[in-house]
């Protein structure tokens, strides 16, 4: 009769300092299908090491171990996991049930790693628990079960994938006599159903219930009677659950890992929340800085555009502050006319300015008076609250009219509903108010400077007595490149003057500089926020490393029932990613709350969340989980199942 399990000259030794300590010495043993065998020996005799080798949890240092004719030494770790999953079932002295799972969920674990469909494995788990007398304890956690009930759950788990070979390590060691007798009766029933049952014990009363007793002492077998051939009942062989295809197994294990991750988070709510806190703050910082920074950037650019978009200012001299008398009269009215004829010009306005006293009744204020054309307000995109600008006839006739800004109107006419038509004194010259320019809001606040505008002809001839212009402002048509327009403008005036006695100031360059500056500042703040995200990620890695240490025994249990190293890696990696994703979602919610509060206090800001910002937050959370979860997950996957099971 061919042996199901066969060991030939198997030895197992472990390093101890510079020496090797032999635990098993030249063990040769055959166990046939359907046998009930007891391996007995005192503590330290090597019986547990022998059981670990029989269950493919450990490998011999030398010798050969075959399972159904297959040499175990030729199998890779995944093949060994499959062998444990499909052929072996473990029953431990301390039950080794996962405390955060129900009885049924504990029983299902081997089927999860076999890729069995959820409904099928749930039905089989309930069937096994019913057979073992636990139909009313299916949804109970281990803490609500007695020792005997927990051991029966452990037996059901061993049978989940068929359990052709049942390895029981001191199965009654932690039970009272009555529960112990019940467990032994179940093991005898399994033997009668065709299972091969191997019991490791030091209790001679337990060993006596086996068909064959193998005694081990100091790593050597000292008593090994021959196997007895015994006729079994027909039709009671161990039921084997067919495993699912690879893709289904992966999907099932992924869902289970996701479920386990969620249960692990729920089991330690406070620790999970504190772990997430770093991610929450990091993601909230990144998203808030991106969103609020973009709103601030748009506000800054809007303020710059309010000063005149697509505009080019022309000033006499070489640069600002140049008071050389030969350049003072460089710009003439004819230059303005020539500029207005250019096809790329939308509008152009001259400018002369002077400080004046403006009086109305007993109110006397100082203002900055600007002599401009009617196109000035179009050039700077200004609208009117009352009245309108001056027309070409008023400019030609040097009309004594004035446009006030909102601040000047409040100072001169605090109690008047309509001021158009009112007469004020500009210096000693009476002028009629024909319009009030609309106040333009700004993130920097509204200017307290008082401004008034008169026709440039009135300002030049009647007030200042000069024929030249202080500056010309040109608005370029939409779609025309402002840099090229500036070059053509420079060429035109240089040809007219015969020399370059002026300089230009392109507002687009200011806009571009502001965009670059705000982008740099936003990038810097984002990097600061990313640092907080990295700190949060390190916190996740630290807690996950602690979690791996705390759950070492759980990892050993999962490996014993058939989990591959990749399954363990996947589970802990998913846990880290899930912590970061939930933290990221809470971080986005926090950033939305921050944005909402800012919107209340800064109603002029347009704060909005783009898909790019939200997608970036999601990717950041996922990447953080993968990056900082990899090391703990790898450490978990590299654990030796024997060492993991031995830890408390």
From Swiss-Prot:
Residues 5-243 form the ABC transporter domain. GO terms for cellular component: plasma membrane. The chain crosses the membrane at residues 273-293, 417-437, 523-543, 577-597, 611-631. Keywords: Antibiotic resistance, ATP-binding, Cell inner membrane, Cell membrane, Membrane, Nucleotide-binding, Translocase, Transmembrane, Transmembrane helix, Transport. It is a multi-pass membrane protein. One of its GO terms (biological process) is response to antibiotic. GO terms for molecular function: ATP binding; ATP hydrolysis activity; transmembrane transporter activity. InterPro entries: AAA+_ATPase, ABC3_permease_C, ABC_transporter-like_ATP-bd, ABC_transporter-like_CS, MacB-like_ATP-bd, MacB_PCD, Macrolide_Exporter_MacB, P-loop_NTPase. Its main location: membrane. PROSITE patterns: ABC_TRANSPORTER_1, ABC_TRANSPORTER_2, MACB. It is found in: Cell inner membrane. CDD domains: ABC_MJ0796_LolCDE_FtsE. It comes from the Bacteria. Its EC number is 7.6.2.-. ATP binds at residues 41-48. Part of the tripartite efflux system MacAB-TolC. MacB is a non-canonical ABC transporter that contains transmembrane domains (TMD), which form a pore in the inner membrane, and an ATP-binding domain (NBD), which is responsible for energy generation. Confers resistance against macrolides. Homodimer. Part of the tripartite efflux system MacAB-TolC, which is composed of an inner membrane transporter, MacB, a periplasmic membrane fusion protein, MacA, and an outer membrane component, TolC. The complex forms a large protein conduit and can translocate molecules across both the inner and outer membranes. Interacts with MacA. Belongs to the ABC transporter superfamily. Macrolide exporter (TC 3.A.1.122) family. This is Macrolide export ATP-binding/permease protein MacB. It comes from Salmonella typhimurium (strain LT2 / SGSC1412 / ATCC 700720). The gene is macB.
């Amino acid at each position: 009769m061919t042996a199901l399990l066969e060991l030939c000259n198997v030895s197992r030794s472990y390093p101890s300092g510079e020496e090797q300590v032999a635990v098993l010495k030249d063990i040769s043993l055959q166990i046939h299908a359907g046998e009930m065998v007891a391996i007995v020996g005192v503590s330290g005799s090597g019986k547990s090491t022998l059981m670990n080798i029989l269950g493919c949890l450990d490998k011999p240092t030398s010798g050969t171990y075959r399972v159904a004719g297959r040499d175990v030494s030729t199998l890779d770790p995944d093949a060994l996991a499959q062998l444990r999953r499909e052929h072996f079932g473990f029953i431990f002295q301390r039950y080794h049930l996962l405390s955060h799972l129900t009885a049924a969920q504990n029983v299902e674990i081997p089927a999860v790693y076999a890729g069995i469909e959820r409904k099928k494995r749930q039905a089989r788990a309930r069937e096994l628990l019913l057979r073992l007398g636990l139909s009313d304890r299916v949804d109970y956690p281990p803490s609500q079960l007695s020792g005997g009930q927990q051991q029966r759950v452990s037996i059901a788990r061993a049978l989940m994938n068929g359990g052709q070979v049942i390895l029981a390590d001191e199965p009654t060691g932690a039970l009272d006599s009555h529960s112990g007798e019940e467990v032994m009766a179940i093991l005898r029933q399994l033997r009668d159903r065709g299972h091969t049952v191997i019991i490791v014990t030091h209790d001679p009363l337990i060993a006596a219930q086996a068909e064959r007793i193998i005694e081990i002492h100091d790593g050597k077998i000292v008593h090994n009677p021959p196997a007895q051939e015994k006729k079994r009942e027909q039709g009671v062989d161990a039921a084997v659950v067919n495993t699912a295809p690879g893709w289904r197994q992966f999907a099932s294990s992924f869902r289970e890992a996701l479920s386990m991750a969620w249960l692990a988070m729920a089991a330690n709510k406070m620790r999970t929340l504190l772990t997430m806190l770093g991610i929450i703050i990091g993601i909230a910082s990144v998203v808030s800085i991106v969103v609020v920074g973009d709103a601030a950037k748009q506000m800054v650019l809007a303020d710059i555009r309010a000063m005149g978009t697509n505009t080019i200012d022309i000033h006499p001299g070489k640069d600002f502050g140049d008071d050389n008398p030969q350049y003072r009269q460089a710009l003439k009215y004819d230059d303005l006319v020539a500029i207005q004829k250019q096809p790329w010009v939308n509008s152009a306005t001259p400018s002369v300015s002077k400080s004046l006293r403006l009086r109305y009744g007993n109110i006397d204020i100082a203002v900055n008076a600007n002599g401009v054309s009617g196109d000035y307000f179009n050039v700077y995109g200004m609208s009117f609250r009352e009245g309108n600008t001056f027309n070409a006839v008023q400019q030609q006739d040097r009309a004594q009219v004035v446009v006030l800004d909102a601040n000047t109107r409040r100072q001169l006419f605090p109690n008047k509903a309509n001021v158009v038509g009112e007469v004020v004194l500009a210096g000693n010259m009476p002028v009629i108010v024909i319009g009030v320019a609309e106040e333009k809001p700004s993130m920097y606040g509204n200017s307290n400077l008082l401004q008034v505008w008169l026709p440039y002809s009135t300002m030049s001839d009647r007030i200042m007595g000069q024929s030249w212009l202080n500056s010309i402002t040109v608005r370029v048509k939409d779609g025309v490149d402002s840099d090229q327009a500036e070059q053509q403008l420079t060429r035109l005036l240089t040809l007219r003057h015969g020399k370059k006695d002026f300089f230009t100031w392109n507002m687009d360059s200011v806009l571009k500089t502001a965009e670059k500056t705000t982008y740099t500042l936003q990038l810097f703040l984002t990097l600061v926020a990313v640092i907080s995200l990295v700190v949060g990620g390190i916190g996740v890695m630290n807690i996950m490393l602690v979690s791996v240490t705390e759950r070492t025994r759980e990892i050993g249990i999962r490996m014993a029932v058939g989990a591959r190293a990749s399954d363990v890696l996947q589970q802990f990696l998913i846990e880290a990613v899930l912590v970061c994703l939930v933290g990221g979602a809470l971080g986005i919610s926090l950033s939305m709350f921050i944005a909402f509060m800012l919107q209340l206090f800064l109603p002029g800001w347009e704060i909005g969340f783009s898909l790019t910002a939200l997608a970036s937050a999601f990717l950041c959370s996922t990447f953080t989980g993968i990056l900082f979860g990899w090391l703990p997950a790898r450490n978990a996957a590299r654990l030796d199942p024997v060492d993991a099971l031995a830890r408390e």
